Swiss-Prot record:
Its EC number is 6.3.4.19. PANTHER family: TRNA(ILE)-LYSIDINE SYNTHASE-RELATED. GO terms for biological process: tRNA modification. GO terms for molecular function: ATP binding; tRNA(Ile)-lysidine synthase activity. The keyword Iron-sulfur does not apply. Ligates lysine onto the cytidine present at position 34 of the AUA codon-specific tRNA(Ile) that contains the anticodon CAU, in an ATP-dependent manner. Cytidine is converted to lysidine, thus changing the amino acid specificity of the tRNA from methionine to isoleucine. The N-terminal region contains the highly conserved SGGXDS motif, predicted to be a P-loop motif involved in ATP binding. Keywords: ATP-binding, Cytoplasm, Ligase, Nucleotide-binding, tRNA processing. This is tRNA(Ile)-lysidine synthase. It is an enzyme of class 6 (ligase).
Length: 476
C-alpha cells in the first residue's frame, strides 16, 4: 500500500494509463478541496512530466455573490501560482428553463461545453476532473437505487474519449478524507459549496448515512467499488461490440432521424444484447445527448412493447421520439409534421415526384412492358378519362379490383398489406378524371387494368412507379 497521497495517485495513474508525458491538461477547478488537490498534484508533476496546465472555472450563477467569489478565488490562486486561468459566468437557470431540463443536467452541459472550448483553444490532450473514490461509491449506489443502464451501473470512467482527446479522473483511487488531509498538509484553504450538505439530494444522503457504514465494514471499500467499475466497463465494452454487430443485421432502414428494425430478428438476440441494442438506437437518434428523463425503464418498455400480441401501436419517448410498431417491423424516429392532403394532376406523358422522393411516370405506347410487376399499371388509352389525378386517401375510398367482382375498401387493402398507419396518409391514390380509383401503386390494380395475357395490339396508357431506392418498395 502506498504511504502518501501523491504516491497513491501516481500508482493509480500508472495502473490505468491515465496520462502521457508532454501533454497539455485542462484542469476543471471549482475551488473546492477535490479540484484543488488535483491541481496541486499535477503542478507537482509538471516539471518532471513536462505538463502544460490550464485551469478552467465555470460560475454557474446559482449562488449569487458566493459563486462569484469562488470565481475570484480561483483567478487569484492561479495568478499566484503562475497558471493560465480561463473562467466564464453562465446563467444556468436561464439555460435550464430554455431547454426544459433539471439544474444538474443543465449545469453539466454548460460546464462540459466550456471545457471542450478551452480544450480546443489550447490544443489540449486531456481534461482532468477531481472525482475521487467516494464519488465512485456514491455514483454506483445511486444508480443501483434509481435504476440505470448496464453502462451506467459501471459508474464513473477513469478515462474516456472527449473532443479530440480524453476526459480523465486521476483521483478515483483516493478517498475524500485523503484529499482533505493532502490539502491540510499543503495549507490550502478551499472554498466549500454548502449545497453539498443539503439532504434534498440523493447523493448527499448516501454520503451522510450509507457510506460511513460501508467504510466501517471495509475502510478501503472505494477500491472494491473501483475494481467492480473496471470489470463492468470491460464486460460492457465487449457486449457493446457484440450488440453493434448483431444490430447491423436486425436494422432494415436507417437515416439521420429514423431507424427501423425487424422484430423477429431482434427477438432472436439474447436479452443482454437486446437491451444494449435499444440503447445503441437511442444513442444514435439522440446523438448521445440522452434526455435526463430517459432511463432503463424506457428500454424495458420497448422490449415489453415488442412482446405484445397487438400487431400495431406506438410509444412516446422524451424529446418527441416516437416508436411505432406495424406488424413485424418497428420504427424509431422523431415526430414529423402531419402529412397534408394532396391532389395533383398527372399529364400523359408526364412525371410527378411524390413527397417521399419517388416518382410516377406516364407514357403512351402500342407495346406493353415486358415486366408487368407491381410497379407498373397498364390500361387501354381510350378506357381512361383524363387528366390522371394523384391524391391522398379519403374516408370511404373504394376501388374495383382486377379479376374480382364488386369493390373493396382502400382501408382493407392497407390492413391486408400490413401498411403502417403513418404511411397510409402519404400513399398515392391514382384516379381518373371521373374519380374512379384505377391504381393503388405496389398494392392493387383496378378492373381498368389489363394483364399481359389479355393484351392485344392497341394504344395503351402506362404508369410506372419509380422508387428512389433500388428495391422499388420504398413505400412499404
Amino acid at each position: 500500500m502506498k504511504d502518501t497521497f501523491v504516491e497513491k495517485v501516481d500508482d493509480f495513474v500508472r495502473q490505468h494509463d491515465v496520462l502521457k508525458e508532454r501533454s497539455t491538461i485542462v484542469v476543471g477547478v471549482s475551488g473546492g478541496p477535490d479540484s484543488l488537490a488535483l491541481l496541486y498534484y499535477l503542478l507537482e508533476k509538471r516539471a518532471a512530466k513536462q505538463f502544460e496546465i490550464v485551469v478552467a472555472h465555470v460560475d454557474h450563477m446559482f449562488r449569487g455573490d458566493e459563486s462569484h467569489e469562488d470565481l475570484q478565488f480561483v483567478q487569484d490562486l492561479c495568478k499566484g501560482l503562475g497558471v493560465i486561468c480561463e473562467t466564464i459566468r453562465i446563467n444556468v437557470s436561464q439555460y435550464q428553463k430554455q431547454y426544459g431540463m433539471n439544474a444538474q443536467v443543465a449545469a453539466r452541459e454548460c460546464r462540459y461545453a466550456f471545457l471542450e472550448r478551452i480544450m480546443k483553444k489550447y490544443d489540449a490532450r486531456y481534461v482532468a476532473l477531481g472525482h475521487h473514490g467516494d464519488d465512485q461509491v456514491e455514483t454506483i449506489l445511486m444508480r443501483l437505487v434509481r435504476g440505470s443502464t448496464p453502462k451506467g451501473y459501471a459508474g464513473i470512467a477513469v478515462k474516456r474519449p472527449f473532443h479530440n482527446g480524453y476526459l480523465i479522473r486521476p483521483l478515483l483511487g483516493v478517498t475524500k478524507e485523503e484529499i482533505v488531509n493532502y490539502c491540510n498538509e499543503l495549507k490550502i484553504i478551499p472554498r466549500i459549496d454548502p449545497s453539498n450538505k443539503k439532504e434534498v439530494y440523493t447523493r448527499n444522503r448516501l454520503r451522510k448515512y450509507v457510506l460511513p457504514h460501508l467504510k466501517e465494514e471495509n475502510p478501503q471499500v472505494h477500491e472494491k467499488f473501483q475494481k467492480f467499475s473496471m470489470q463492468m466497463q470491460e464486460d460492457e465494452a465487449y457486449l457493446q461490440e457484440l450488440a453493434f454487430e448483431k444490430m447491423n443485421k436486425v436494422i432494415t432502414k436507417k437515416s439521420d432521424k429514423q431507424i427501423s428494425l425487424s422484430i423477429p430478428a431482434f427477438e432472436s438476440m439474447s436479452m443482454p444484447l437486446q437491451r444494449r441494442g435499444i440503447q445503441l438506437i437511442l444513442n444514435y437518434l439522440y446523438e448521445y445527448k440522452i434526455p435526463s428523463s430517459l432511463s432503463s425503464i424506457h428500454i424495458d418498455k420497448v422490449i415489453e412493447f415488442f412482446k405484445r400480441t397487438q400487431p400495431s401501436g406506438s410509444l412516446d419517448f422524451p424529446g418527441d421520439l416516437k416508436i411505432v410498431r406495424a406488424y413485424e417491423e418497428c420504427s424509431f424516429g422523431f415526430k414529423q409534421e402531419i402529412v397534408s392532403p394532396f391532389l395533383q394532376d398527372l399529364s400523359v406523358p408526364g412525371t410527378i415526384t411524390l413527397s417521399n422522393g419517388d416518382k410516377l411516370v406516364t407514357e403512351v405506347s402500342e407495346d406493353i412492358p415486358s415486366d408487368m410487376n407491381e410497379t407498373v399499371f397498364v390500361a387501354k388509352y381510350n378506357d381512361i378519362s383524363y387528366p390522371i389525378r394523384i391524391r391522398s386517401r379519403e374516408n370511404g375510398d373504394r376501388m374495383s379490383i382486377q379479376g374480382m367482382n364488386g369493390t373493396k375498401k382502400i382501408k382493407a387493402i392497407f390492413i391486408e398489406a400490413k401498411v403502417p398507419r403513418e404511411k397510409r396518409e402519404e400513399w398515392p391514390v391514382v384516379c381518373d378524371a371521373s374519380g374512379n380509383i384505377i391504381w393503388l401503386p405496389l398494392l392493387k390494380r383496378s378492373a381498368f387494368a389489363i394483364s399481359k395475357e389479355t393484351a392485344k395490339k392497341d394504344k395503351y396508357m402506362i404508369i410506372h412507379y419509380k422508387s428512389k431506392e433500388s428495391s422499388g418498395r420504398i413505400m412499404k
